[in-house]
């Protein structure tokens, strides 16, 4: 079987690795904007092209006799790549454009949840101009300001160190109104966690919970990023997430897929639910229509079920006939990013990977030239420790990072006992 992966980041490197482990011995191909050495090493062939160039991607898929495509990033979904592939008779793991909209139009997503009585939304309003904007911000008091469109996780700002007062929140919202709608939401207090699921249009196969860390600097300071690292626990939960919390989060995702199915376009691919665990249970921060990055790198190395079987079940609508299983291990993923990331990243600097021991290595936004690897303006290399405990997995990941050299920055605190305990204590205080 010939399988194509779209995208050239760390998430796609993890997807490619999972496909390459298949006992079905698929021939793997890729379309990516820059040569990711981790993906290229696993491929029979690859095309360097814009991942949003639908005509070129479909043409390449036809040329190579591709039977299934795994679409990694969100941008190709937003331009209808899954639609074009399916219309060409090629199976796509990735939803069609009108249901992928749940990610790339946050205003539509909130209204969709409201219209379908799906639990988990905070108080919110969508604004296309300044009328009533200041009054609503003042009414809520503490707010989150979100551009409606795709921002790579970096456009959202919340009250606190990012927006010190309602005046700053108003000014930021006004700055986003140029060419886009703005979503103003109640700023929820709690701990964030991610639940991801393979979806075949009606059935969901859930992966272990993960907690991502968006802030650039240790102790959760600095600007938002695409994600500096993440961890998962061996029981599929998180130290601050109960079975009941997870049940409610999954029920929200199931209700969302059921409602999307009623639109006459089945949602086939990955549904990513980013939740915040509050005093009143899990609430939805956002939905994404693909694997998270870095969260894919936590869960895919644990996948026991053959990835080709999972992809086939997604495409054919038969996930209910497949037992999708994961190893009961803990993981810690840490990113090395260019110095100055995300605001003023150091570009075109060589990255040298030394002895990473037992860690897994996933290349992200880098490029290979003359046998050497260089940074771009985004996250460079991720390492993943896999062990029986989060603490042991963190040690594996951190030791690996220490042996990757270049003009790079990383967070040492992700997955450490101190940071994990801080999350647990925070939730204990909130639940009182």
UniProtKB/Swiss-Prot annotation:
Keyword Manganese attributed: yes
Needed cofactors: Mg(2+); Mn(2+)
Keyword RNA-binding carried by entry: no
Binding residues annotated for Mn(2+) 1, in chain numbering: 274, 286
Binding note for cofactor: Binds 2 magnesium or manganese ions per subunit.
Binding site for Mg(2+) 1: 274, 286
Entries under InterPro entries matching the protein: ATP-grasp, ATP_grasp_subdomain_1, PreATP-grasp_dom_sf, PRibGlycinamid_synth_ATP-grasp, PRibGlycinamide_synth, PRibGlycinamide_synth_C-dom, PRibGlycinamide_synth_C_sf, PRibGlycinamide_synth_CS
Residues that coordinate or bind ATP: 137-194
Domain ATP-grasp: 110-316
Gene3D superfamilies on file: 3.40.50.20, ATP-grasp fold, A domain (3.30.1490.20), ATP-grasp fold, B domain (3.30.470.20), Phosphoribosylglycinamide synthetase, C-terminal domain (3.90.600.10)
Residues holding Mg(2+) 2: 286, 288
EC nos: 6.3.4.13
A molecular function GO annotation: phosphoribosylamine-glycine ligase activity
PROSITE patterns: ATP_GRASP, GARS
Keyword set, alphabetical order: ATP-binding, Ligase, Magnesium, Manganese, Metal-binding, Nucleotide-binding, Purine biosynthesis
UniProt pathway: Purine metabolism; IMP biosynthesis via de novo pathway; N(1)-(5-phospho-D-ribosyl)glycinamide from 5-phospho-alpha-D-ribose 1-diphosphate: step 2/2
One of the GO BP terms on file: 'de novo' IMP biosynthetic process
Binding sites annotated in the UniProt record for Mn(2+) 2: 286, 288
PANTHER family, sorted: PHOSPHORIBOSYLAMINE--GLYCINE LIGASE, PHOSPHORIBOSYLAMINE--GLYCINE LIGASE, CHLOROPLASTIC
UniProt family annotation: Belongs to the GARS family.
Protein's UniProt name: Phosphoribosylamine--glycine ligase
Taxonomic lineage of the native organism: Archaea, Methanobacteriati, Methanobacteriota, Stenosarchaea group, Methanomicrobia
């Amino acid at each position: 079987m010939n399988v194509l992966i779209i995208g050239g980041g760390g998430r796609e490197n993890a997807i490619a690795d999972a496909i390459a482990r298949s006992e079905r011995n698929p021939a793997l191909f890729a379309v990516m904007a820059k040569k990711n050495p981790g993906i290229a090493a696993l491929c029979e062939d690859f095309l360097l092209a814009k991942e949003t160039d639908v005509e070129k991607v479909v043409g390449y898929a036809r040329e190579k006799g591709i039977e299934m495509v795994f679409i990694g990033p969100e941008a190709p979904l937003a331009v209808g790549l899954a639609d074009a592939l399916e219309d060409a008779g090629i199976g796509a793991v990735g939803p069609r454009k009108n249901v992928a909209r749940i990610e790339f139009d946050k205003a539509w997503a909130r209204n969709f949840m409201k219209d379908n009585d799906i639990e988990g939304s905070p108080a919110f309003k969508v604004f296309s101009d300044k009328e009533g904007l200041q009054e609503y911000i003042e009414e809520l008091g503490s707010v989150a300001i979100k551009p409606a469109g795709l921002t790579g996780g970096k456009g959202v700002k919340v009250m606190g160190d990012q927006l010190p007062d309602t005046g700053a929140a108003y000014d930021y919202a006004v700055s986003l109104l140029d060419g886009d709608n703005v979503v103003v939401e109640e700023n929820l207090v709690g701990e964030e966690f991610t639940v991801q699921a393979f979806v075949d249009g009606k059935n969901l196969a859930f992966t272990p919970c993960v907690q991502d860390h968006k802030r650039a600097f240790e102790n959760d300071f600095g600007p938002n990023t695409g994600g500096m690292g993440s961890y998962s626990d061996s029981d599929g939960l998180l130290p601050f997430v109960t079975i009941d919390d997870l049940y409610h989060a999954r029920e929200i995702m199931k209700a969302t897929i059921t409602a999307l199915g009623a639109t006459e376009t089945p949602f086939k691919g990955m549904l990513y639910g980013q939740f915040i665990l509050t005093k009143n249970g899990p609430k939805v921060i956002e939905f994404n229509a693909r694997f998270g990055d870095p969260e894919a790198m936590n869960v895919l190395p644990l996948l026991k079920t053959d990835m080709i079987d999972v992809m086939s079940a997604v495409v054919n609508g038969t996930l209910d006939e497949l037992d999708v299983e994961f190893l009961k291990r803990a993981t810690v993923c840490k990113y090395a990013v260019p110095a100055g990331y995300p605001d003023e990243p150091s570009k075109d600097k060589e990255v040298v990977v030394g002895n990473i021991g037992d860690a897994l290595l996933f290349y992200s936004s880098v490029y290979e030239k003359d046998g050497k690897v260089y940074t771009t303006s985004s996250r460079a290399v991720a390492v993943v420790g896999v062990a029986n405990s989060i603490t042991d997995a963190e040690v594996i990941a951190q030791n690996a990072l220490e042996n990757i050299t270049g003009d790079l920055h990383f967070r040492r605190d992700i997955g450490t006992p101190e940071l994990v305990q801080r999350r647990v204590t925070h939730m204990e205080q909130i639940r009182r």
